[in-house]
């Protein structure tokens, strides 16, 4: 992102939020190619850890939860994963390798939820709905028409629904609902 993690916590507290789920990108573009898995996870968790520390320091009742926006190799699709923890990340290996069916099975074996993020953006393909629990029906950086299409798909398929700001700059603050 383009905003320091500590500043993100302050922005959301100012907007009256009680918490945030940090779903940083975990994709082939996130890491240097020569990084070992340990270094990748340390890097991936750094923003979350800084946000969690800032929330504790603030003295406010503000919860910071760990999530993930996962992209597999060779695709533009993004998947939001809720419920993950640090131990899982260090033990799971390279999460960009397993595709939808295998990833869904792995996540469900741990009690995590998998949502397709912004499914109607250009370049994204709608995934097999058997391998997701839900659909992001509102994305703060996606136009209203495409968000509405996502909501219709979620309702028709009986999937859970979520909303996100897709925070990358201060202008995206609190745009997720």
Predicted regions, residues:
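A metal-dependent hydrolase metal-coordination microenvironment
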Residues: 1-101, 130, 134-157, 169-172
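Active-site-proximal loop/helix segments of hydrolase catalytic cores
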Residues: 2, 110, 115-127, 143-145
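Internal catalytic-core helix/loop-beta-alpha segment
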Residues: 93-121
């Amino acid at each position: 992102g383009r905003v320091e993690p500590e500043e993100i916590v302050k922005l959301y507290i100012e907007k009256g939020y009680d918490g945030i789920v940090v779903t940083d990108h975990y994709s082939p573009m996130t890491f240097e190619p020569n990084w070992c898995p340990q270094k990748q996870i340390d890097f991936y968790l750094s923003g979350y850890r800084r946000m969690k520390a800032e929330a504790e320091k603030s003295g406010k009742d503000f919860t910071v939860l760990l999530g993930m926006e996962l992209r597999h190799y060779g695709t533009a699709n993004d998947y939001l994963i809720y419920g993950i923890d640090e131990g899982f990340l260090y033990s799971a290996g390279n999460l960009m390798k397993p595709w939808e069916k295998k990833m869904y099975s792995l996540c469900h074996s741990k009690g995590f939820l998998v949502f397709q993020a912004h499914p109607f953006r250009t370049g994204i393909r709608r995934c097999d709905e058997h391998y997701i629990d839900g659909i992001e029906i509102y994305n703060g950086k996606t136009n209203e028409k495409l968000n509405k299409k996502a909501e219709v798909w979620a309702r028709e398929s009986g999937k859970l629904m979520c909303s996100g700001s897709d925070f990358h700059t201060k202008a995206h603050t609190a745009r997720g609902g």
